[in-house]
């Protein structure tokens, strides 16, 4: 989509919405076989979608805590091993039908964006924790993976 850097809360949320739509466009026309074919390391597109949903569900509460003026991450929780979290999120949905994983993606996006919208403007500024949480788990994440999916589709003429 675009690499335009958002400067306000509204721009950030709008950018997330645009990249979400672009991510869905990258999936358009793919069938069950395409969605479950492993091609990104050990992952399929279904796994990509599942792990994004996992981050939504994991980081939504962090945004809710920030909106209440609390620390975003509970004591004792670490996200240093992102790959382990990614693997966990993908594995949690591996046995679910593609349609259910896609539905959960839509629901988790809606939940995450609702949590992001509730963060006060003064806490949702470029460079602040809330800003990074929103961008990294929405626009940036959608763009990263939609680009990978589009490249895979081009390589396969899909």
Regions inferred by a protein language model and the residue ranges of each:
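Hydrophobic packing residues in well-ordered alpha-helices of helical domains and bundles
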Residues: 9, 13-16, 20, 98-105, ...
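Acidic/histidine-rich alpha-helical segments that form the ligand environment
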Residues: 81-122
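Positions in alpha-helical segments
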Residues: 7, 11, 43, 47, ...
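Short, contiguous alpha-helical
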Residues: 34-84, 118-158
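Basic/polar N-terminal segments that are highly enriched at the extreme N-terminus
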Residues: 1-7, 157-158
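Alpha-helical bundle segments that constitute or directly flank the non-heme di-iron/ferroxidase center
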Residues: 5-32, 54, 58-65
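Amphipathic, well-ordered alpha-helical segments in soluble domains
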Residues: 19-26, 55, 108-111, 115, ...
């Amino acid at each position: 989509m675009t690499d335009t850097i958002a400067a306000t809360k509204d721009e950030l949320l709008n950018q997330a919405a645009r990249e979400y739509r672009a991510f869905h466009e990258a999936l358009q026309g793919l069938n069950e076989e395409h969605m479950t074919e492993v091609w990104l390391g050990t992952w399929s597109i279904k796994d990509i979608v599942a792990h994004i949903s996992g981050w939504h569900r994991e980081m939504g509460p962090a945004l809710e805590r920030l909106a209440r003026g609390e620390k975003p991450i509970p004591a004792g929780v670490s996200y240093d091993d992102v790959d382990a979290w990614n693997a966990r999120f993908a594995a949690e949905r591996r046995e679910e039908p593609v349609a259910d994983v896609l539905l959960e993606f839509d629901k988790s996006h809606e939940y995450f964006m609702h949590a992001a919208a509730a963060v006060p403007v003064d806490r949702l500024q470029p460079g602040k924790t809330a800003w990074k949480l929103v961008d990294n788990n929405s626009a940036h994440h959608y763009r990263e993976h939609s680009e990978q999916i589009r490249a895979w589709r081009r390589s396969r003429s899909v």
